[in-house]
Amino acid sequence: MLLLALIVVILSLLVFAARRRHGYWQRRGIPHDEVHPLFGNIKDWPNKRHIAEIFRDYYFKYKNSDYPFAGFFFFFTRTAVVTDMELLKRVLIKDFNHFENRGVFYNEIDDPLSATLFSIEGQKWRHLRHKLTPTFTSGKMKNMFPIVVKVGEEMDKVFRSKTAADRGQVLEVVDLVARYTADVIGNCAFGLNCNSLYDPKAEFVSIGKRAITEHRYGNMLDIFLFGFPKLSRRLRLKLNIQEAEDFYTKIVRETIDYRLRTKEKRNDFMDSLIEMYKNEQSGNSEDGLTFNELLAQAFIFFVAGFETSSTTMGFALYELARNQDVQDKLREEIGNVFGKHNKEFTYEGIKEMKYLEQVVMETLRKYPVLAHLTRMTDTDFSPEDPKYFIAKGTIVVIPALGIHYDPDIYPEPEIFKPERFTDEEIAARPSCTWLPFGEGPRNCIGLRFGMMQTCVGLAYLIRGYKFSVSPETQIPMKIVVKNILISAENGIHLKVEKLAK
């Protein structure tokens, strides 16, 4: 009887604590939805709706309220969903010192692959960002450009082998372009000729896909990792599957050993990491990287470059197939620039393809691969206006998908219109309203590389092939709701016709 009474008391205290925590926004008078006692405001994810769609709808519901954000709970985690452009700029840029960290899970001791530049916090992030920034200069991109072009040529050969000039062929294009991006990253990050364009079952790609789509514990514990990152770290939980950790550790160690032994230089991402590793080994930790730090950055370079660029290329081809006038205009630009540069793809030539860049930017507006940004308040944010107060430890969500589809910012947002990204149109819009790579000091460090490999790949494909919708093309597009990243459900099937060169 005493035990039963004790259980009742404990459960009552837990219910009281949960209700009190979930009542935070109501006590402050901040607009918010009704909170589920267990799931907070996230009960429809990951089974019914994509998390970015939940934040998008929240943005539209509360964007005209008197407050610059709306209250939200990710289970029991206090979250502020930004609805005001001025607050957005303060979070990402002006008051970045209050919002430096993302508040996501990483465990550098037990799960070294998780301790990436994207995830780590505080002084460690600042030091690592400073060390890695020179790796992504325009000069470094130019050095890696020939590698990207070489893989682009191989992709062209694969597409030609799969299409017939007289009638065309329906292809699932995301898988094919994913093999292109995997071979680019394999070359630039690991110095490997992965050969995945010719071997769809190549281990480098199959393990890579599993590293992105599979996590160690399944959906429920994944949610726990993201909802309670600090507690998960104390419990020594891991995010990445053991096969991925073992595979990439082996690949990176073998690559380092080979290049140090042979003194081979490839002017790629791995060369830069190895130079920093050598600094660490010689006692210069200020400019150096440990093996685990190098491993994590090589891994995130693969994951980010492989998934985001291939997904963006797939969505771009989908929109070009549905908008033949845009495709024709893009093909004309590519042909003109290609001819001007002696019928070669050059670094300078790709930079001249302004309409191609606009097509990619418009694709990323409609389909931002990471469609919401997170920051965490490291200290109380107490500006002059008390409405802007955000308490320490609050997760701040920037609903990029909502902003990208806001008709006050992008009129007729459902229409695919690359001209939105002319210099004049960009200047006429508020800043921080195009967010596929984030913004401010913690934006995506690999932006230039991602744009480069995406533009090169699309230039090869649009120059050589016509893409059209087919009966197998899914219209409207459906996205996979359980993933954090935006991706097409069941792939993207398009009719591909070979063009005369």
Swiss-Prot record:
It is found in: Endoplasmic reticulum membrane; Microsome membrane. Heme binds at C444. GO terms for biological process: thermosensory behavior. Keywords: Endoplasmic reticulum, Heme, Iron, Membrane, Metal-binding, Microsome, Monooxygenase, Oxidoreductase. The keyword Iron applies. One of its GO terms (cellular component) is endoplasmic reticulum membrane. Its cofactor is heme. GO terms for molecular function: heme binding; iron ion binding; monooxygenase activity; oxidoreductase activity, acting on paired donors, with incorporation or reduction of molecular oxygen. PROSITE patterns: CYTOCHROME_P450 (PS00086). Pfam families: p450. CDD domains: CYP6-like. Its EC number is 1.14.-.-. It comes from the Eukaryota. Its main location: endoplasmic reticulum. InterPro entries: Cyt_P450 (IPR001128), Cyt_P450_CS (IPR017972), Cyt_P450_E_grp-I (IPR002401), Cyt_P450_sf (IPR036396), Insect_CytP450_Detox (IPR050476). It is a peripheral membrane protein. Belongs to the cytochrome P450 family. May be involved in the metabolism of insect hormones and in the breakdown of synthetic insecticides. This is Probable cytochrome P450 6a17. It comes from Drosophila melanogaster (Fruit fly). The gene is Cyp6a17.
